[in-house]
Amino acid sequence: MQTKYQYGIYIGRFQPFHLGHLRTLNLALEKAEQVIIILGSHRVAADTRNPWRSPERMAMIEACLSPQILKRVHFLTVRDWLYSDNLWLAAVQQQVLKITGGSNSVVVLGHRKDASSYYLNLFPQWDYLETGHYPDFSSTAIRGAYFEGKEGDYLDKVPPAIADYLQTFQKSERYIALCDEYQFLQAYKQAWATAPYAPTFITTDAVVVQAGHVLMVRRQAKPGLGLIALPGGFIKQNETLVEGMLRELKEETRLKVPLPVLRGSIVDSHVFDAPGRSLRGRTITHAYFIQLPGGELPAVKGGDDAQKAWWMSLADLYAQEEQIYEDHFQIIQHFVSKV
């Protein structure tokens, strides 16, 4: 391993950027002439796990650094690819290549704290530097204290510039909405706390596509109140997966297509089971791809758990990625990329 590198790479979500992150960044600046900070979870919808968007996180980190240091720091963003490490890796490699020009003098810095750190093993072409564990600093714990209003439990865990940002953000409508969602999720999990085993929830989702449009709804229930989602929901004990999917589809969209036609138009299905895909807990969804023939889009109307139902063009879908619930954007991508 070299003692000095041309580039250091530091990957994280930084939700929020805390003193442990700052220590690692300072180490990267010692070991490398330039540091590339890669912000993960780019363009995901704001929730209690990812409250801040990429430009906000970038601004938070920049506020902690001097103008001289900032000249040595590059920021990149990368989307989540929960179901394809290769696509995530390709995105990281393409972004990094734009800055490094293919240099071999590159080191990745990080700490293998748990299963979520497995990505650190995916870069054999670059050296790896273990930064060590900072047990006093956890973004998860900081967010929890933040949404519970316990300033004494987190203000000393973040740089002063971040503390100022967090206090200002508390005045925003997003913070108020996220606090409400945080309390909902805590109560939701508490309701299952006495179960003999940790629950695993089974849901279904319908990906209905016609003529370059996908059928979407706007949620009117927490979590994800107001976000754009696929029609779907929990399976009932007395129905099959397909029956549950079709029931939820009809309840939430009032789609004017007969059930036999919908059932006959199912062309694909897939299980989406990323362990962290839902903040409610372990939730596995069975998604069904329904391809309707071209022509006039059938009438729809929101119902049940949906404020609204409408046909969204695929172009609008990509433009509004930051408003799409959980991993539903990736579910849609999985199916439409095949046709």
Curated annotation (Swiss-Prot):
<dbReference type="GO" id="GO:0016787">
    <property type="term" value="F:hydrolase activity"/>
</dbReference>
<keyword id="KW-0511">Multifunctional enzyme</keyword>
<dbReference type="InterPro" id="IPR014729">
    <property type="entry name" value="Rossmann-like_a/b/a_fold"/>
</dbReference>
<keyword id="KW-0464">Manganese</keyword>
<comment type="pathway">
    <text>Cofactor biosynthesis; NAD(+) biosynthesis; NAD(+) from nicotinamide D-ribonucleotide: step 1/1.</text>
</comment>
<feature type="domain" description="Nudix hydrolase">
    <location>
        <begin position="199"/>
        <end position="335"/>
    </location>
</feature>
<dbReference type="InterPro" id="IPR015797">
    <property type="entry name" value="NUDIX_hydrolase-like_dom_sf"/>
</dbReference>
<keyword id="KW-0808">Transferase</keyword>
<dbReference type="GO" id="GO:0005737">
    <property type="term" value="C:cytoplasm"/>
</dbReference>
<comment type="similarity">
    <text>In the N-terminal section; belongs to the archaeal NMN adenylyltransferase family.</text>
</comment>
<keyword id="KW-0963">Cytoplasm</keyword>
<dbReference type="GO" id="GO:0042802">
    <property type="term" value="F:identical protein binding"/>
</dbReference>
<keyword id="KW-0067">ATP-binding</keyword>
<feature type="region of interest" description="NMN adenylyltransferase">
    <location>
        <begin position="1"/>
        <end position="183"/>
    </location>
</feature>
<comment type="function">
    <text>The Nudix hydrolase domain is active on ADP-ribose, (2')-phospho-ADP-ribose, IDP-ribose and NADPH.</text>
</comment>
<dbReference type="GO" id="GO:0005524">
    <property type="term" value="F:ATP binding"/>
</dbReference>
<protein>
    <recommendedName>
        <fullName>Bifunctional NMN adenylyltransferase/Nudix hydrolase</fullName>
        <ecNumber>2.7.7.1</ecNumber>
        <ecNumber>3.6.1.-</ecNumber>
    </recommendedName>
</protein>
<dbReference type="InterPro" id="IPR004821">
    <property type="entry name" value="Cyt_trans-like"/>
</dbReference>
<dbReference type="Pfam" id="PF01467">
    <property type="entry name" value="CTP_transf_like"/>
</dbReference>
<dbReference type="InterPro" id="IPR041750">
    <property type="entry name" value="NMNAT_Nudix"/>
</dbReference>
<keyword id="KW-0662">Pyridine nucleotide biosynthesis</keyword>
<keyword id="KW-0460">Magnesium</keyword>
<dbReference type="GO" id="GO:0009435">
    <property type="term" value="P:NAD biosynthetic process"/>
</dbReference>
<dbReference type="GO" id="GO:0000309">
    <property type="term" value="F:nicotinamide-nucleotide adenylyltransferase activity"/>
</dbReference>
<feature type="short sequence motif" description="Nudix box">
    <location>
        <begin position="233"/>
        <end position="254"/>
    </location>
</feature>
<dbReference type="Pfam" id="PF00293">
    <property type="entry name" value="NUDIX"/>
</dbReference>
<keyword id="KW-0548">Nucleotidyltransferase</keyword>
<keyword id="KW-0520">NAD</keyword>
<keyword id="KW-0378">Hydrolase</keyword>
<dbReference type="InterPro" id="IPR020084">
    <property type="entry name" value="NUDIX_hydrolase_CS"/>
</dbReference>
<dbReference type="InterPro" id="IPR000086">
    <property type="entry name" value="NUDIX_hydrolase_dom"/>
</dbReference>
<keyword id="KW-0547">Nucleotide-binding</keyword>
